[in-house]
A protein has these predicted regions:
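Mature extracytoplasmic or organellar-lumen-exposed domains after removal of signal/transit peptides
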Residues: 16-126
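Bacterial Sec-dependent N-terminal signal peptides
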Residues: 1-17
């Protein structure tokens, strides 16, 4: 799966400007989400502080100049940070894996919303 993630990230990178903070957040998401889907929440539990730090850095970073949808990206980044912080609190409170599952899915969906918005202004959907 590491190779698949690597190749997928290369395809995404080829389509749009590099955004280091997006890549760093994605790395943690990809390394923790798939194991959680299979019922193993240990990776995200051990890396949630790192994920929160990366989410805040992602929100505070400069959106690449050629991206359109900047307002929508900013709004979604705020949501990502809010959801990551809430997820961290839930993990720290000792919530069951079952209780964490839906929150992690929502966080994953929010990240993919951001990825979908990250297009150069001259790229059009057909």
């Amino acid at each position: 799966t590491v190779m698949a993630v690597f190749f997928m990230s290369q395809v995404v990178s080829a389509q749009t400007s590099e955004w280091k903070e997006k890549t760093e957040f994605h790395k943690i998401m990809s390394q923790t989400f798939h194991s959680a889907e299979e019922g193993n929440f240990a990776p995200i539990k051990s890396r949630i502080d790192e994920m929160e730090t990366k989410a805040v850095a992602f929100k505070n970073s400069e959106i690449p100049a050629d991206f359109g949808n900047k307002d929508a990206i900013k709004k979604s980044l705020k949501k990502l940070v809010k959801e990551t912080k809430a997820f961290n609190k839930k993990i720290k409170s000792g919530a069951s894996d079952e209780a964490l599952k839906n929150d992690f899915m929502a966080l994953h969906d929010t990240f993919h919303t951001i990825v979908g918005l990250c297009k150069a202004e001259d790229e059009h959907e057909h």
